[in-house]
């Protein structure tokens, strides 16, 4: 397949060297690529970490670390309060990567080779409980960073110990040099079948993921800024470009005849939005459930487009799209709202109602609701800085679990917002309030300018619980894990992983097509290629809290590790006799675990995986070998089999007090690492409780010994504040909620724990006082058991205990509630404790509290001799202890009784040589204990049945409500979709029927008016022309025959044959000529006349009237159009003339008024100067001028001053309704008192309400300024006048455009100083200031 030279994206691009573009990956486990990839990707997808084969040296260290921290199903994760559907593990997929498939198809010319995958490297891994195979994590295990607190900061330049930023597994799709502009928007869109991305010229390339078919959609003339599919299984693509063109394409495939199948794009909507200039990133967003509704942002406007109403009845064209101006919207387009700056992002969600969020460079985020013109809420999430992203994220488990994620400038600051209601649930309301719950701030410590260090694109994958940020400046992808929690307010970002890519990412999109697969496919538009990266969800999840010591973290918590050699010393084994971990046939349970046991803290990061754990050096200086698996240990040491416990999905997943070492569990990955969601059934809860025995034995030698051996224990290792499982389960059974897990011990449980601790404190004194007797008892018990068996086989003992413990395990969590009374499970690790150790110090072991003794400390104090009196004393104290423990409420008493029963049985078996009198008290005590045990069991069963029924019914109701909501929502969405589809089909059918009917009418009219008359006339002429000769030929033989026969009969008798023959000949000839002539003459006269009359009547009755009516209608339309056009033209011309004359008249009036005011001013000044001169003259000539002021001089002065009263002139002008001249005269005097008097003489409000205004804009502006200058006097009246005047001013008037702004600012400043005016004046001042502020904004 050769492509044309002009095609920038050929159908079959030649192979290119990946080494020149993409960085080689050092990952020892490349991604699965199927049969189509080259050898560089032909690696194994599924590899079992726990098979019998020896691992290779390359990944040996990695497997060792995984074996130490693989029990991820025991980690205390947050449980969900709603049901979670189970995950069905899928079989391994041969080719899960569509990008690989496309690359192979393109390189092979579109032909898909049916090649069987190679299986020589694949090994089927068997998972406990039927789990399927999983993807092997990359050899570069990324160690992310936990995000803690409401404000988390991540420095991209700081690398903590062990942090790795691996390069993602890449699959090239095509080589293409994209436009390297860093802009917002999605330049690529992907669904299950197609990949679409924009080219430089505005075209859109479409690729079929499965068949590698390609197509090019043309229509946009500039760069495509955003595109999106309606859904992953609906082939509706919406795109928008810089020129404001909006297209909706319906993608389909088909073939004509024997031709190859082709991808076609039918244009559903072609629209161009006009009225916005200099748009940088128009955006597009589909409605959540309605595929006919589309939301588009163009510049500052947000538009809602109904594709069923836009251009109804028209055929759209990509070359000439339908134009829609923002000032005059067409049918089907409406404005949702507007920002003060350009809109940067759109997102929608639906719960109870549909919400649309829009972000803008003006720093605001607005949330809109259907059929409301005002936003529900306006947020300024980033202190007024531009907002680049706003995304609604909905939990995949609950449709009402909705949060809002916003991104600041460069998407460097990410915030989570939830509704301010109870627990953050969204409820329908006219107004809403949102609050920020967490902030993630990305920073660079080496680059002070953020623009040079960051340009992030953001997408949210709600199904996978991930927030992905692609930094084009650093060639990196930051994966932020979202922990949804049980409510929106508990949703938080808890983990961040960083990955590197080969080149800058300009735009990207992510998909999770198969939720059962633990992968996210990220499709990227990069500077030199279109590529697909595979992101393993296993690498993005936060590691469990219990394994926090083995991961990189900035936390100060260190991980405890129980060492095997802590128990070897008590059994007499030397360190060199320690058996290999791989040789242990069964897992063992350590009983002697206490807070004083030796703990080992490993350094953070994966570097610890390649370093042998440090040896533990006891006080004598001899090093001991650690119990952790080393690099050279066998594979079986990392994965030892363990009993499978089926989980009960709704009950608490806590273990009932039994401690299991890490080696006792297989590496069972939780479902969420297989691509699903974390549910309440995915995890156990292992609560490490205090070893009461170790805590209560406050012996100085024990403490000193433990301090010397455990120097790495941090304060966080003290878990004394955590309640024990037995204390927790003394109360009736109930479902554990996250709040109970976080809040710890409730009030009732706290009181029980306090009481139990008080009893244990009472036991300390007895233990300290009789330590000697206890030591003797320990020795005798050990000797008794040794003498019975002769020798001790540690392997056999371990196996017996382990198998016995497995038989006693209940297979549901509900049974764990009564484990203290139903199990006696004390298997012991090889050499970890002396057999019979459960009777040490006379205190029975309680399974819930894990009471036991450190065998090292006890054995160090054992004496060389003993006596039987110590055993008697011990037995008596054991009975006291039984009495005390039996007084405790609930399950603690039952647990103690079970332990005492076991102790009594051991004493009986060890004292077979004693007399029967010694056994009688023990038998009585045993009988009493058995009775108490039976009663406790019955009571516990009753409590369990009562406690379990209530929560189950409650959860059933919750499940019923949730299912009802889900069904209602699904039914509503389906009904809406069906109704929309029905309406769409009805409209299409109606349109088709209407077009068909119109076409039939047109054809019928054309045939009747044009062709029918001509055909009829032509046919009639032709037929009548041939009728005459035909009729003559038919009639003549009949007449001849008749006449001849008649003549023959009449003349046969008298006339001879000769006369008859002559007469016949003459008659025939004459008759023939006569008949022919008559017939011809008859048809030429009567026939022609009849035909002409028929044609004439037809024309007069049908054709001519219809033609006249058509002509009349046509001429009437032409006449009306002409008259309307002439009228419009005349009115426009008249308006133009009137406007010109009005401006001239206005100018003349202003000139006259100004001249009159100047004249009046000159008269006033002349009179004033004349009066002054007269006064000076009179004073200089006659000193008695003051006495004669009432004489002729006084009259002269009065005569000069008499015309100076302006109110008379103003009153005359008002009476003549010359308001413009009166106000101009008053304002020219610059006397505010005269202006105030004039305002009081007229009804200013009514005057300003006239249309047109009698006062010009210049007079109004001057009046506002002068009234404001004297606002301190008569404030209330002047504020009222100013209010009327300011509402009548039009700042866009060209007459005052130059002077409006400075005068408005002056008035605003004057009013600003009078904001403290009394009473009602304050509201008037604020109102005028608000109006002036609006006018100032419009003057820009």
Swiss-Prot record:
<feature type="modified residue" description="Phosphoserine">
    <location>
        <position position="91"/>
    </location>
</feature>
<keyword id="KW-0175">Coiled coil</keyword>
<feature type="repeat" description="WD 2">
    <location>
        <begin position="338"/>
        <end position="378"/>
    </location>
</feature>
<feature type="compositionally biased region" description="Polar residues">
    <location>
        <begin position="884"/>
        <end position="897"/>
    </location>
</feature>
<dbReference type="InterPro" id="IPR045152">
    <property type="entry name" value="EDC4-like"/>
</dbReference>
<dbReference type="GO" id="GO:0042803">
    <property type="term" value="F:protein homodimerization activity"/>
</dbReference>
<feature type="region of interest" description="Disordered">
    <location>
        <begin position="1"/>
        <end position="101"/>
    </location>
</feature>
<dbReference type="InterPro" id="IPR015943">
    <property type="entry name" value="WD40/YVTN_repeat-like_dom_sf"/>
</dbReference>
<dbReference type="InterPro" id="IPR032401">
    <property type="entry name" value="EDC4_WD40"/>
</dbReference>
<feature type="compositionally biased region" description="Basic and acidic residues">
    <location>
        <begin position="848"/>
        <end position="859"/>
    </location>
</feature>
<feature type="repeat" description="WD 1">
    <location>
        <begin position="219"/>
        <end position="259"/>
    </location>
</feature>
<feature type="region of interest" description="Disordered">
    <location>
        <begin position="700"/>
        <end position="719"/>
    </location>
</feature>
<feature type="compositionally biased region" description="Polar residues">
    <location>
        <begin position="56"/>
        <end position="82"/>
    </location>
</feature>
<feature type="compositionally biased region" description="Polar residues">
    <location>
        <begin position="1"/>
        <end position="10"/>
    </location>
</feature>
<comment type="function">
    <text>As a component of the decapping complex, may play a role in the degradation of mRNAs.</text>
</comment>
<keyword id="KW-0853">WD repeat</keyword>
<feature type="domain" description="LEM">
    <location>
        <begin position="1182"/>
        <end position="1226"/>
    </location>
</feature>
<dbReference type="GO" id="GO:0000932">
    <property type="term" value="C:P-body"/>
</dbReference>
<keyword id="KW-0963">Cytoplasm</keyword>
<feature type="compositionally biased region" description="Polar residues">
    <location>
        <begin position="36"/>
        <end position="45"/>
    </location>
</feature>
<dbReference type="Pfam" id="PF16529">
    <property type="entry name" value="Ge1_WD40"/>
</dbReference>
<comment type="similarity">
    <text>Belongs to the WD repeat EDC4 family.</text>
</comment>
<dbReference type="GO" id="GO:0031087">
    <property type="term" value="P:deadenylation-independent decapping of nuclear-transcribed mRNA"/>
</dbReference>
<dbReference type="InterPro" id="IPR044938">
    <property type="entry name" value="EDC4_C_sf"/>
</dbReference>
<keyword id="KW-0597">Phosphoprotein</keyword>
<feature type="compositionally biased region" description="Basic and acidic residues">
    <location>
        <begin position="793"/>
        <end position="806"/>
    </location>
</feature>
<dbReference type="InterPro" id="IPR049404">
    <property type="entry name" value="EDC4_C"/>
</dbReference>
<feature type="coiled-coil region">
    <location>
        <begin position="926"/>
        <end position="946"/>
    </location>
</feature>
<feature type="coiled-coil region">
    <location>
        <begin position="1148"/>
        <end position="1168"/>
    </location>
</feature>
<feature type="region of interest" description="Disordered">
    <location>
        <begin position="828"/>
        <end position="897"/>
    </location>
</feature>
<feature type="modified residue" description="Phosphoserine">
    <location>
        <position position="680"/>
    </location>
</feature>
<feature type="modified residue" description="Phosphothreonine">
    <location>
        <position position="79"/>
    </location>
</feature>
<dbReference type="InterPro" id="IPR036322">
    <property type="entry name" value="WD40_repeat_dom_sf"/>
</dbReference>
<keyword id="KW-0677">Repeat</keyword>
<dbReference type="InterPro" id="IPR001680">
    <property type="entry name" value="WD40_rpt"/>
</dbReference>
<feature type="repeat" description="WD 3">
    <location>
        <begin position="381"/>
        <end position="427"/>
    </location>
</feature>
<dbReference type="Pfam" id="PF21289">
    <property type="entry name" value="EDC4_C"/>
</dbReference>
<keyword id="KW-0507">mRNA processing</keyword>
<feature type="region of interest" description="Disordered">
    <location>
        <begin position="783"/>
        <end position="806"/>
    </location>
</feature>
<protein>
    <recommendedName>
        <fullName>Varicose-related protein</fullName>
    </recommendedName>
</protein>
<dbReference type="GO" id="GO:0007186">
    <property type="term" value="P:G protein-coupled receptor signaling pathway"/>
</dbReference>
<feature type="region of interest" description="Disordered">
    <location>
        <begin position="611"/>
        <end position="644"/>
    </location>
</feature>
